Design a protein with these regions (language model features):
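Alpha-helical solenoid repeat scaffolds of the TPR/TPR-like class and their adjacent stem/linker regions
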Residues: 1-179
Length: 179
Protein backbone atom coordinates (compact mmCIF):
# COMPACT_ATOMS: atom_id res chain seq x y z
CA UNK A 1 0.00 0.00 0.00
CA UNK A 2 2.81 2.43 0.87
CA UNK A 3 4.67 1.78 -2.37
CA UNK A 4 1.44 2.38 -4.34
CA UNK A 5 0.86 5.63 -2.45
CA UNK A 6 4.39 6.88 -3.08
CA UNK A 7 4.23 5.87 -6.77
CA UNK A 8 0.87 7.62 -7.14
CA UNK A 9 2.22 10.79 -5.55
CA UNK A 10 5.12 10.80 -8.03
CA UNK A 11 2.73 10.36 -10.97
CA UNK A 12 0.40 13.12 -9.75
CA UNK A 13 3.36 15.45 -9.17
CA UNK A 14 4.20 15.21 -12.89
CA UNK A 15 0.69 16.35 -13.86
CA UNK A 16 -0.42 19.96 -14.13
CA UNK A 17 -2.88 19.91 -11.24
CA UNK A 18 -4.65 22.95 -9.82
CA UNK A 19 -6.58 23.26 -6.57
CA UNK A 20 -8.41 26.39 -5.42
CA UNK A 21 -9.21 25.09 -1.96
CA UNK A 22 -7.75 21.71 -1.03
CA UNK A 23 -9.91 21.52 2.08
CA UNK A 24 -13.03 21.55 -0.09
CA UNK A 25 -11.62 19.72 -3.11
CA UNK A 26 -9.63 17.02 -1.29
CA UNK A 27 -11.33 17.09 2.11
CA UNK A 28 -9.11 14.47 3.71
CA UNK A 29 -5.90 14.37 5.66
CA UNK A 30 -3.13 11.81 5.48
CA UNK A 31 -3.38 10.87 9.15
CA UNK A 32 -3.88 7.15 8.57
CA UNK A 33 -0.48 6.67 6.94
CA UNK A 34 0.96 6.90 10.43
CA UNK A 35 -0.36 3.37 10.91
CA UNK A 36 1.88 2.01 8.12
CA UNK A 37 4.72 1.44 10.59
CA UNK A 38 7.34 3.07 8.43
CA UNK A 39 9.09 6.44 8.24
CA UNK A 40 6.62 8.98 6.86
CA UNK A 41 9.02 11.87 6.28
CA UNK A 42 9.51 11.52 2.52
CA UNK A 43 5.86 10.75 1.85
CA UNK A 44 4.75 13.75 3.92
CA UNK A 45 7.31 15.98 2.21
CA UNK A 46 6.22 14.83 -1.28
CA UNK A 47 2.55 15.28 -0.47
CA UNK A 48 3.15 18.78 0.90
CA UNK A 49 5.14 19.72 -2.22
CA UNK A 50 2.30 18.41 -4.39
CA UNK A 51 -0.28 20.53 -2.52
CA UNK A 52 1.91 23.65 -2.69
CA UNK A 53 2.46 23.16 -6.43
CA UNK A 54 -1.27 22.65 -7.06
CA UNK A 55 -2.32 25.48 -4.74
CA UNK A 56 0.47 28.05 -4.19
CA UNK A 57 -1.83 30.24 -2.06
CA UNK A 58 -1.65 27.55 0.66
CA UNK A 59 1.83 28.73 1.63
CA UNK A 60 1.17 32.47 1.62
CA UNK A 61 2.07 34.65 4.55
CA UNK A 62 -0.92 36.15 6.32
CA UNK A 63 0.91 37.89 9.12
CA UNK A 64 3.32 40.67 9.74
CA UNK A 65 6.20 40.80 12.15
CA UNK A 66 5.61 41.58 15.84
CA UNK A 67 2.55 43.72 16.42
CA UNK A 68 4.01 45.57 19.42
CA UNK A 69 1.75 44.26 22.16
CA UNK A 70 3.09 44.33 25.71
CA UNK A 71 2.44 40.61 26.21
CA UNK A 72 3.46 37.83 23.86
CA UNK A 73 0.35 36.73 21.98
CA UNK A 74 0.15 32.93 21.76
CA UNK A 75 -2.61 31.04 19.98
CA UNK A 76 -3.52 27.35 20.12
CA UNK A 77 -5.55 25.85 17.29
CA UNK A 78 -7.24 22.47 16.98
CA UNK A 79 -10.59 20.98 16.13
CA UNK A 80 -9.84 18.61 19.03
CA UNK A 81 -10.07 21.20 21.85
CA UNK A 82 -13.23 19.53 22.97
CA UNK A 83 -14.09 16.28 24.71
CA UNK A 84 -11.12 14.56 23.18
CA UNK A 85 -7.81 13.38 24.59
CA UNK A 86 -6.00 16.15 22.67
CA UNK A 87 -8.09 18.84 24.34
CA UNK A 88 -7.66 17.24 27.74
CA UNK A 89 -3.90 16.90 27.28
CA UNK A 90 -3.21 20.49 26.23
CA UNK A 91 -5.82 22.35 28.28
CA UNK A 92 -3.41 22.68 31.21
CA UNK A 93 -0.70 24.25 29.06
CA UNK A 94 -3.11 26.98 27.98
CA UNK A 95 -4.55 27.40 31.45
CA UNK A 96 -1.28 27.79 33.34
CA UNK A 97 0.74 30.03 31.02
CA UNK A 98 1.91 33.12 32.95
CA UNK A 99 -0.67 35.77 32.06
CA UNK A 100 1.51 38.69 33.12
CA UNK A 101 3.72 37.93 30.08
CA UNK A 102 1.48 35.94 27.74
CA UNK A 103 -1.93 36.54 26.15
CA UNK A 104 -3.50 33.17 25.21
CA UNK A 105 -6.07 32.66 22.47
CA UNK A 106 -7.69 29.28 21.78
CA UNK A 107 -9.17 28.49 18.36
CA UNK A 108 -11.47 25.63 17.43
CA UNK A 109 -14.11 25.01 14.77
CA UNK A 110 -17.23 23.53 16.32
CA UNK A 111 -19.94 25.44 18.05
CA UNK A 112 -22.15 23.76 20.56
CA UNK A 113 -22.11 22.88 24.18
CA UNK A 114 -18.97 21.04 25.08
CA UNK A 115 -17.79 21.07 28.69
CA UNK A 116 -14.08 20.91 27.85
CA UNK A 117 -14.25 23.74 25.30
CA UNK A 118 -16.27 25.78 27.83
CA UNK A 119 -13.53 25.23 30.43
CA UNK A 120 -10.79 26.14 27.95
CA UNK A 121 -12.69 29.28 26.92
CA UNK A 122 -12.87 30.37 30.57
CA UNK A 123 -9.17 29.67 31.17
CA UNK A 124 -7.73 31.67 28.25
CA UNK A 125 -7.78 35.37 27.45
CA UNK A 126 -9.70 34.91 24.21
CA UNK A 127 -11.54 32.00 22.59
CA UNK A 128 -12.56 31.99 18.95
CA UNK A 129 -14.74 29.61 16.96
CA UNK A 130 -13.30 29.54 13.45
CA UNK A 131 -15.44 29.14 10.35
CA UNK A 132 -15.12 25.73 8.67
CA UNK A 133 -13.70 27.36 5.53
CA UNK A 134 -9.96 27.50 4.92
CA UNK A 135 -9.67 31.05 3.59
CA UNK A 136 -11.90 32.57 6.24
CA UNK A 137 -10.22 30.64 9.06
CA UNK A 138 -6.79 31.85 7.89
CA UNK A 139 -7.96 35.47 7.86
CA UNK A 140 -9.56 35.20 11.28
CA UNK A 141 -6.41 33.75 12.87
CA UNK A 142 -4.12 36.27 11.14
CA UNK A 143 -6.35 39.14 12.27
CA UNK A 144 -5.63 38.35 15.94
CA UNK A 145 -1.99 39.41 15.50
CA UNK A 146 -0.36 36.43 17.14
CA UNK A 147 3.35 36.24 17.85
CA UNK A 148 3.23 32.45 18.13
CA UNK A 149 0.71 29.97 16.73
CA UNK A 150 0.73 26.47 18.19
CA UNK A 151 -1.07 23.59 16.53
CA UNK A 152 -1.85 20.97 19.15
CA UNK A 153 -2.09 18.46 16.31
CA UNK A 154 -1.63 18.52 12.54
CA UNK A 155 -3.12 15.92 10.26
CA UNK A 156 -5.82 14.40 12.43
CA UNK A 157 -8.33 16.21 10.26
CA UNK A 158 -7.97 18.16 7.01
CA UNK A 159 -8.74 21.75 8.02
CA UNK A 160 -5.86 22.20 10.47
CA UNK A 161 -3.59 20.26 8.11
CA UNK A 162 -4.23 22.74 5.30
CA UNK A 163 -4.17 25.73 7.70
CA UNK A 164 -0.67 24.73 8.75
CA UNK A 165 0.73 25.47 5.28
CA UNK A 166 0.16 29.23 5.67
CA UNK A 167 2.25 31.62 7.73
CA UNK A 168 -0.33 32.89 10.25
CA UNK A 169 2.15 34.05 12.90
CA UNK A 170 5.87 34.88 12.86
CA UNK A 171 6.54 31.70 14.87
CA UNK A 172 4.53 28.52 14.29
CA UNK A 173 4.97 25.12 15.88
CA UNK A 174 3.17 21.88 16.58
CA UNK A 175 2.75 19.87 19.76
CA UNK A 176 2.62 16.09 19.98
CA UNK A 177 -0.93 15.63 18.79
CA UNK A 178 -2.82 12.59 19.98
CA UNK A 179 -1.47 11.53 23.40
Amino acid sequence: ARRELDDSLQKIARLDCHLDDPYVEVGASNFLISYHDTNNRDTQKNLAALYLKACPSLGEAHCEERYGYSRVRVGFVSRQLQLNSVGRCFHGIMRFMPRENIHVTAFTFSKGSDPLWSAIAQDVDQSIILPPRLGEARKKIAKTGLDILIYTDIGMEPLTYFLSFARLAPVQCVLGGHP
